[in-house]
Amino acid sequence: MAALFLKKLTLQTVKTENYCIRRCLGKYILQGPAPTQQPPRPSCLIHAKAFSTEDTQDEMTKKKKNETAFSSVGRKINERIIHVLDEQGNDLGHMHRANVIRLMAERDLRLVKRDASAEPPQYQLLTGAQIHQERLRLREAERAAPKPGPTLTKELTFSSNIGQHDLDTKSKQIQQWIEKKYKVQITVKKGKSADEPEDKMEEMCNRIVQTMSGIATFSSRPQPIRGGKAVMCVLRPLSKKEEAAWKAAPDTPRRDALNGGDGKDGASGVLPQ
């Protein structure tokens, strides 16, 4: 009996000691480290495409080029009924796309779009060689077409006592520039001869234009510069409208070229309207 009581007392003492230890040291043992302040986390960066009309225009240009490119559409015909021409250019009339695809397989032909704005759209059956030749033709036409851009100006200076041979050489150079759609600024300096006529410099400008009737005219009439020691004028190519007017009046090209111009850039007034 005494042994049982002693055992209970011992267990009670151990429990009391454990409780006191947990009470005194529990906050140091069980308590985790104090949270440290974390640096601010940057927000997630999302790449956003900048707004630009240029990108849209580029995409539209590429799409337009793809639409206008001369190539076979294959079997992807969006319209049910189309207007068809054969490889010889003969009109086959309106056909269902299924019949067109069957005709392509029978004759080993390709289908290209000719006029998408027509109703129904117009297509043509061509051989591979015909498509290749048409592409070459379109490429050559594109190269030959004038490139849009600012008009460049060439400059040429010479003396009024220049020899006839040298003057002819310079006139040919001016003509080559005009044919390439350049403007040409001509400056004629007064010669050293004392008995030289006052209007000789202006007359030389008129003579140059006279040799180029039908291709060039004055953009700026001859005007004295440098205190009358030189004369300057500007020549430009004829516009398409002026070329047509010149061809319609072939008997007066020289007179028109000599009498034209009002002294202002971009206005000639040389051809009959």
UniProtKB/Swiss-Prot annotation:
Record field: compositional bias (Basic and acidic residues): 252-265
Keywords, in A-Z order: Initiation factor, Mitochondrion, Protein biosynthesis, Transit peptide
Gene Ontology CC: one annotated term: mitochondrial matrix
Propeptide, chain numbering: 33-92
Region entry Disordered, spans: 242-273
Keyword Lipid metabolism recorded: no
Any Pfam family: IF3_C
SUPFAM superfamilies to which the protein is assigned, alphabetical: Translation initiation factor IF3, C-terminal domain, Translation initiation factor IF3, N-terminal domain
Keyword Mitochondrion: yes
Molecular functions (GO terms): ribosomal small subunit binding; ribosome binding; translation factor activity, RNA binding; translation initiation factor activity
Transit peptide boundaries: 1-32
GO biological process assignments: mitochondrial translational initiation; ribosome disassembly
PANTHER family: TRANSLATION INITIATION FACTOR IF-3 (PTHR10938), TRANSLATION INITIATION FACTOR IF-3, MITOCHONDRIAL (PTHR10938:SF0)
Family membership noted in the UniProt record: Belongs to the IF-3 family.
Role according to the record: IF-3 binds to the 28S ribosomal subunit and shifts the equilibrium between 55S ribosomes and their 39S and 28S subunits in favor of the free subunits, thus enhancing the availability of 28S subunits on which protein synthesis initiation begins.
Protein name, as recorded: Translation initiation factor IF-3, mitochondrial
Phylogenetic classification of the source organism: Eukaryota, Metazoa, Chordata, Craniata, Vertebrata
Gene encoding the protein: MTIF3
